[in-house]
A protein has these predicted regions:
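Small-residue hinge/turn detector
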Residues: 140-152
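Glycosyltransferase-associated regions of secretory-pathway enzymes
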Residues: 1-139, 157-355
């Protein structure tokens, strides 16, 4: 046996120590090089409620947020007149459509207000416990924080997805800038002084690359708004965030996506109203440019005459002749209408995360 005190033993020991040191140094450098992504994935993995083959695929994240407010739309039992369930059956179909069409090119993340405290470092606000309109304001801020940290695409949970959103997303961020989608203007202040603004930007349908400086600026702006003692007084009327985004669009810092692509407009540039979605008369969407149609979920809940749709069972919806039912059926079918998308490798499974 060779002694470590012999000449050969000393040389062997020195070489061994040198190899171990080099391996440790290389390992440390490699860890530092990959740690940001690894830490991000580990953070999300920690708060998953279901197993998902997420890791190892370099895909952007697609964020779908749902609210679980205390409501009386569907009772759990005869003695219970309210619950905190989602209680909107059609949303289960819209979310399924997004997962089905986009799950092979995005890591789909299903989140709620409680997810923010888990995924955003140093986030201490309990959004679910806030009253309105503060809750929505802080929710918008938190969604921007998620986009800044992780990047990806925010998609409303009431979007009926007909085609993969990958092309829309990548064309939106091709200049390394964020993008927002155009939606119908609901802000009264935009129509003051004789102006009649039909459409404006809306951050509910938005995409951005990770660590975007413009998203960082938006976050700082929203923080200033939340620090304002008067910010609770009708923020929707003034549309502060939309005005800020519109200004950045004019400066070419943010890209505006035509509402035609998300089905809030017809091919004739006419606004798609709720009545039309719930009617049987065909709507002229673009067969090549419309990726899906956005059901105005907030309006359906606010307007009594449409609330019946929010509680209608899924099987009953799909049996009707409503336009929205036809598109829901199409979104869940196995046949793709478009043939301009190349097939994704079978090794890329659909990934869905509930956070």
């Amino acid at each position: 046996m060779m002694s470590i005190f012999s000449e050969n033993g000393i040389i062997y020991t020195i070489i061994t120590i040198g190899i171990v040191f080099a391996v440790n140094l290389f390992g440390t450098q490699l860890k530092e090089a990959i740690s940001p992504e690894s830490e991000e994935n580990e953070l999300i993995r920690k708060y998953l409620l279901n197993e998902s083959p997420l890791y190892g695929y370099n895909r952007p994240k697609l964020w779908i947020h749902s609210t679980y407010e205390y409501n009386a739309r569907t009772w759990k039992s005869f003695g219970s007149r309210s619950s905190t369930d989602l209680n909107q059956p059609y949303i289960h179909l819209t979310v399924r459509s997004i997962v089905k069409k986009c799950g092979q090119d995005f890591n789909v993340c299903l989140i709620d207000d409680d997810s923010f405290n888990q995924l955003i470092p140093n986030w201490t606000v309990k959004v679910s416990e806030l009253p309105e309109p503060a809750r929505q304001t802080f929710r918008d801020l938190a969604m921007c924080e998620l986009l800044f940290i992780y990047g990806g695409l925010l998609v409303p949970n009431t979007f009926v997805c007909l085609h993969n959103l990958s092309t829309l997303y990548h064309s939106g961020i091709e200049l390394n800038t964020p993008f927002v989608c155009e939606m119908s203007n609901k802000y009264g202040s935009f129509n003051s002084g004789g102006n009649n603004t039909k459409y404006t930007s809306n951050t509910r349908f938005m995409g951005a690359p990770k660590r975007s400086p413009v998203i960082r600026e938006m976050i700082e702006y929203l923080k200033i708004r939340t620090d304002d003692p008067h910010f609770n007084s009708e923020p929707d009327f003034f549309g502060y965030t939309s005005k800020w985004v519109n200004h950045e669009i004019l400066r070419e810092k943010i890209k505006l996506i035509d509402g035609l692509h998300i089905g809030i407009k017809t091919i004739d540039n006419k606004t798609v109203e709720i009545d039309e979605l719930l009617d049987s008369e065909p709507i002229k969407f673009s067969p090549t440019e419309t990726y899906g149609l956005l059901i105005p979920g907030d309006e359906i809940l606010k307007r009594t005459c449409y609330q019946w749709f929010s509680v209608m069972p899924v099987d009953e919806i799909l049996k009707t002749n409503m336009v929205v039912a036809k598109y829901l059926m199409a979104s869940l079918s196995d046949n793709e209408v478009r043939d301009d998308k190349k097939k994704v490798s079978s090794s890329h499974e659909q990934t869905v995360m509930t956070i």
